[in-house]
């Protein structure tokens, strides 16, 4: 039996995530935005104030975070640790992008697996009157990272793939779509959610000193191929993958990643230029999990933003 969604949620947010927070609130009359005064002392350390602290007692409270750089994490953690202690009925942390997820293992003694460090920090969020904090994360880099969190919090792992499927259904060549994975990791991660599409799997192989991308299985010839992965940094693998797929006869190549990190404006490698040069990617879909990137790539082809707002609004009702 379906439970009606009737939970009134008060949503706080960090400065960077304001636009996404407004979109989330627009999804449901049950979500009301709240505010925090984000200030700094002269020495740079945060001077924070949670507005209406007494009015949120007994209410369901959530915080939308964006850990875009180490510099902003401390001020947001200060708020995240304070909110559950204000006698709230329940507390939910929404962290769309778990930033240290790609450093999740030690390859030699001395490596520091910062994904585990971040999970331990979040596992120590105080319990609220309603019990442990719920931590909502989208497409965490490695699935085993769910076990890095302690029993003090309840991690909820969501995905942006339904947004991609919805968008692919709207394409004029929806019947010609083939999904490609840049490596076995991406295939293991996403193939079950996309198993109604024909699939292509690429692989990185070592040739001398170089690592090159090869087609491992599947046939992209005559199709619109969409490369799917959880995140992009410099984009080098996607570009190599596109070249291989085009060489094997793909008529169009597009890409989807949930988290467009793009450090040092590396998205510029993908933008369509006006000089008539080859447009390698027809579409490049990303979500708004990394607000800084979304601002930087606004209205730049081939990028299209698929918003997580509706999915976050639903998660807040769980």
UniProtKB/Swiss-Prot annotation:
It is an enzyme of class 2 (transferase). The keyword Membrane does not apply. It is found in: Cytoplasm. Its main location: cytoplasm. One of its GO terms (molecular function) is ribose phosphate diphosphokinase activity. InterPro entries: Pribosyltran_N (IPR029099), PRibTrfase_dom (IPR000836), PRTase-like (IPR029057), Rib-P_diPkinase (IPR005946). It catalyses: D-ribose 5-phosphate + ATP = 5-phospho-alpha-D-ribose 1-diphosphate + AMP + H(+). PANTHER family: RIBOSE-PHOSPHATE DIPHOSPHOKINASE FAMILY MEMBER (PTHR10210), RIBOSE-PHOSPHATE PYROPHOSPHOKINASE 4 (PTHR10210:SF34). Belongs to the ribose-phosphate pyrophosphokinase family. This is Ribose-phosphate pyrophosphokinase 4. The gene is PRS4.
């Amino acid at each position: 039996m379906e439970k009606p969604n009737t939970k009134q949620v008060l949503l706080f947010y960090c400065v960077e995530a304001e636009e996404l927070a407004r979109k989330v609130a627009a999804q449901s009359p049950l979500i009301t935005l709240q505010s925090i005064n984000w200030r700094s002392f002269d020495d740079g350390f945060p001077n924070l104030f949670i507005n209406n602290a007494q009015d949120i007692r007994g209410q369901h409270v959530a915080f939308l975070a964006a850990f875009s750089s180490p510099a902003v994490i401390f001020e947001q953690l200060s708020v995240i640790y304070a909110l559950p202690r204000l006698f709230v009925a329940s507390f939910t942390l929404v962290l769309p992008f778990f930033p240290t997820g790609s450093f999740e293992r030690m390859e030699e003694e001395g490596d520091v697996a910062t994904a585990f460090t971040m999970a331990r920090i979040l596992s120590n969020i105080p319990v609220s009157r309603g019990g442990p904090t719920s931590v909502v994360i989208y497409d965490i880099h490695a699935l085993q990272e769910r076990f890095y969190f302690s029993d003090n919090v309840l991690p909820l792992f969501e995905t942006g793939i339904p947004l991609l499927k919805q968008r692919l259904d709207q394409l004029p060549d929806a019947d010609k779509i083939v999904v490609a994975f840049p490596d076995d990791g991406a295939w293991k991660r996403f193939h079950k959610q996309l198993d109604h599409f024909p699939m292509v799997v690429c692989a990185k192989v070592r040739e001398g000193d170089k690592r090159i991308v090869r087609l491992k299985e599947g046939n992209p010839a005559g199709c619109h191929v969409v490369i799917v992965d959880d995140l992009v940094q410099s984009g080098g693998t996607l570009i190599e993958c596109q070249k291989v797929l085009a060489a094997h006869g793909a008529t169009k190549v597009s890409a989807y990643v949930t988290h467009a990190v793009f450090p040092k404006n590396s998205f510029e490698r993908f933008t369509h230029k006006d000089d008539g040069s080859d447009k390698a990617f027809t579409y490049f879909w990303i979500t708004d999990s990394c607000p800084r990137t979304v601002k930087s790539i606004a209205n730049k082809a081939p990028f299209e933003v698929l918003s997580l707002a509706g999915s976050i609004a639903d998660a807040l009702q769980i």
